[in-house]
Amino acid sequence: MKILGIDTSAKTSSVGICDDDKTVDELFLDKGLTHSETILPMIDEILTRNGLTLDDIDALAVNNGPGSFTGIRIGVAVVKGLAFEKNIPCYEVSTLDSIAYNCKDKSGLVVAVMDARRNQVYNANYQIIDGKAEKIKNDRSILIKDLYLEISEYDGDVFVIGDGQDKVKEFFEENNMTQDNFYYPDYYDNLQKGINTALIAYSSLKNKKCGEEILPLYLKLSQAEQELRKKRG
């Protein structure tokens, strides 16, 4: 079963193809371009260089959030359009699940974080069990100081990953919250990856949906919506 995974939920654009639980190919782009400019050409490229067309794809998977409001909308819209055109089933995957998948071969607590501004992060926590990231804290928006209070009590290794990693690390250092069991994996492990999205979808085939059922997961209002509510009192 070939699944095409798509991520536009943060700065990088990413696509990946798996065949059952095996990686076929993956592609990243981090050039400061908007996802609306990059994601469809990336899909064309990864299909072409593997001798495939959309007719060879059995399912689509997308990271539906949390993350960039605009990016999430673009990814979801692309998947909905392709699903409608080709009548392909879809899977929605939490962006935080996709990030945590990078640490499936480690042992300890995985703390997936994405920048949510104002000393907050989007976060979910995972325990690595038998090579799988088992979610123990569901997706949420949380103050970094409150996140610290949770993870500081953990005795084992703690891996802080995601595009909010630098923000969390800086906050911990400025507030004397660093601990010897906190680890900060490098750039590649901080990425939310289209191939992870595809592989996670394959592991949960019972959760398939049709295109119109795929919805963005925001967790909080956009900045514009927050400002509008303030003006309205």
Question: Where do the model's predicted regions map?
Answer:
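N-terminal beta-alpha supersecondary unit
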Residues: 1-66, 141
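Surface "functional belts" at beta-alpha junctions
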Residues: 22, 89-190
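Residues at secondary-structure transition points
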Residues: 30-38, 69-73, 77, 94, ...
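Stable alpha-helical structural segments in soluble proteins, enriched in small hydrophobic residues
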Residues: 46-50, 85, 103, 194-207
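Glycine-rich phosphate-binding loop signature in dinucleotide/nucleotide-binding domains
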Residues: 50-55, 106-108, 152-156, 205-208
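DPxDG-like acidic metal-binding loop motif
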Residues: 59-90, 95
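Acyltransferase
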Residues: 185-233
